[in-house]
A protein has these predicted regions:
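Glycoside hydrolase catalytic-domain context in secreted enzymes
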Residues: 1-386
Length: 386
C-alpha cells in the first residue's frame, strides 16, 4: 500500500511513476496526510531521452561534441519533468575498457577526459540553468566508483584498482561533475579490494564530501546495501545498514534495511543520530533546491510538450553527429543504378523496438523507422528490396 507507507513517513522517493495524475495524487498524500508534509522525489532512469530518444550515450560520445550530450539531456529533462519526474539516474560516467562488460553502451567509453566532458554536459543539460525550474531534473552521476572495471567484464564483480589508478582514470569524471554542481551521486555495486562502494568511507566521505565538497544526496544503487552481504562485507542486513549509513549513504534504493534496522542500530549506539541528521539534511537540501516545497505538483497539461518538433530535430542532429563513417576505399558506394535488388540483412534490419537502443523505458517503437523501411521508402519501386 504505497499511500499507507507515505502517510507513515516511510517513503521519501518513488521510482518509475510516469502518470502525472498519479504523481500528483501521491504528492498530495505526502503533503496533506503525512505528519511532516515533506514532498516526494519522483525518479526514473532517463538515460538518453524520455519520449524523444537520442543516440545511446556511447554513440553521443562518438560525436566528440558535448553540445550533443547537453541538448539531449535538456530535451530529456523537459519531457520527463512534464510527467512529474524530477530525478534521473544519469549520466553513467564509468570509464570502461573491457568490451565484455555488458553496460558499455550506457557510458562514454574508455577515455577519462572524454567521459568527463560529456558527463558535465549531460549534468548541465539535465539540471538546466536552475534546479528549481519546473523543467529541470536532478542528475545522478553513477556508478561511484570503478563499476566499469569489473574483473573479467562480469557485472557486479570485484575490482582491484590501486589508489593512483583510481585517481588517474576512474575518479576524474566524477570530480568534474561534482564541481559542475551534480545534485546527487549513486554508489556502485562493485567492491574495490574487498570494500563495496556502498560501504566505502574513503570514497564517500574522504573523497566525495571531504575533497570535493559535495553536499547533495548519495543514493545506493538498486539494493546495493543488501548486496554487500553477497560480497561478504556484511554478515546480515543489520550490519549492511550500519556500514552503509556510517560510510555516508543517505538514501537506500529498493532494499529495506534502513527502515528495518536503523532504530535498533541507533539504540545500540552503532549508528549515531548525527549520521541520520546528516542524511536527512542532504536529502531535504536537494528537495528544497528543486523547489518541491514551493510546488510539489506537476502541471498535467505539460504532457503536450512530449515529442515537440524541436525535440525531434535535436535528436536527428544528434544521430547525424554520432554516426561513424567507414572509408569507401573500394568504392562500394554509391550503388550503381544498374542494381535492381538490394538485400537488407542483420538483426537490426527490421526490429522497430531495437532502434531505440538500450536502457529505454518510455520510447515508443511505433515511432521508429527501421533500415528496411527507410530504404524501401527511399528507392520506391525502382529497386526490389528484400
Amino acid at each position: 500500500d504505497m499511500s499507507g507507507l507515505i502517510k507513515k513517513g516511510e517513503v521519501g522517493s518513488i521510482l518509475n511513476e510516469v502518470d502525472p495524475v498519479r504523481v500528483n495524487a501521491l504528492q498530495r498524500v505526502a503533503m496533506e496526510e503525512s505528519r511532516l508534509g515533506i514532498p516526494l522525489l519522483m525518479a526514473r532512469d532517463v538515460i538518453h531521452g524520455f519520449k524523444t530518444i537520442f543516440p545511446i550515450p556511447l554513440g553521443q560520445a562518438a560525436s566528440f561534441n558535448p553540445q550533443v550530450a547537453k541538448d539531449g539531456a535538456r530535451v530529456a529533462a523537459v519531457e520527463a519533468s512534464a510527467v512529474g519526474i524530477r530525478w534521473t539516474f544519469a549520466p553513467m560516467i564509468d570509464v570502461a575498457r573491457d568490451p565484455r562488460w555488458g553496460r558499455m553502451a550506457e557510458g562514454c567509453g574508455e577515455d577519462t577526459y572524454l567521459t568527463s566532458v560529456m558527463g558535465v554536459a549531460m549534468v548541465e543539460g539535465f539540471q538546466g540553468d536552475s534546479l528549481n525550474s519546473p523543467t529541470s531534473i536532478a542528475a545522478c552521476p553513477k556508478h561511484f566508483v570503478g563499476y566499469g572495471a569489473a574483473e573479467g567484464g562480469r557485472d557486479y564483480n570485484s575490482t582491484f584498482i590501486p589508489e593512483r589508478r583510481l585517481r588517474d582514470v576512474y575518479l576524474p569524471p566524477f570530480e568534474a561533475v561534482a564541481k559542475a554542481g551534480a545534485a546527487t551521486f549513486m554508489t556502485s555495486f562493485n567492491d574495490n579490494d574487498g570494500a563495496p562502494s556502498t560501504g566505502n568511507t574513503f570514497i564517500l566521505k574522504d573523497v566525495l564530501r571531504g575533497e570535493w565538497g559535495f553536499d547533495g544526496i548519495v543514493v545506493s544503487d538498486w539494493a546495493s546495501v543488501a548486496e554487500m552481504m553477497a560480497h561478504g562485507f556484511a554478515a546480515d542486513s543489520k550490519e549492511a545498514a550500519m556500514k552503509a549509513v556510517n560510510a555516508g549513504v543517505d538514501m537506500e534504493m529498493v532494499s529495506y534495511t534502513f527502515v528495518k534496522e536503523l532504530p535498533e542500530l541507533i539504540k545500540e549506539g552503532k549508528v549515531k543520530k548525527s549520521a541520520i541528521d546528516d542524511a536527512v539534511r542532504n536529502i531535504l537540501r536537494i528537495k528544497f533546491r528543486l523547489g518541491l516545497f514551493d510546488n510539489p505538483y506537476v502541471d498535467e497539461k505539460r504532457i503536450e510538450e512530449l515529442y515537440a518538433p524541436s525535440h525531434l530535430e535535436a535528436a536527428k542532429q544528434a544521430a547525424v553527429e554520432s554516426a561513424i563513417l567507414l572509408k569507401n576505399e573500394k568504392e562500394t558506394l554509391p550503388l550503381q543504378s544498374s542494381v535492381k535488388t538490394v538485400a537488407v540483412v542483420g538483426p537490426m534490419a527490421n526490429a522497430p523496438y531495437d532502434q531505440l537502443g538500450t536502457w529505454i523505458f518510455d520510447g515508443d517503437k511505433t515511432k521508429t523507422v527501421t533500415p528496411l523501411k527507410a530504404i524501401k521508402e527511399l528507392v520506391g519501386d525502382k529497386v526490389q528490396v528484400i
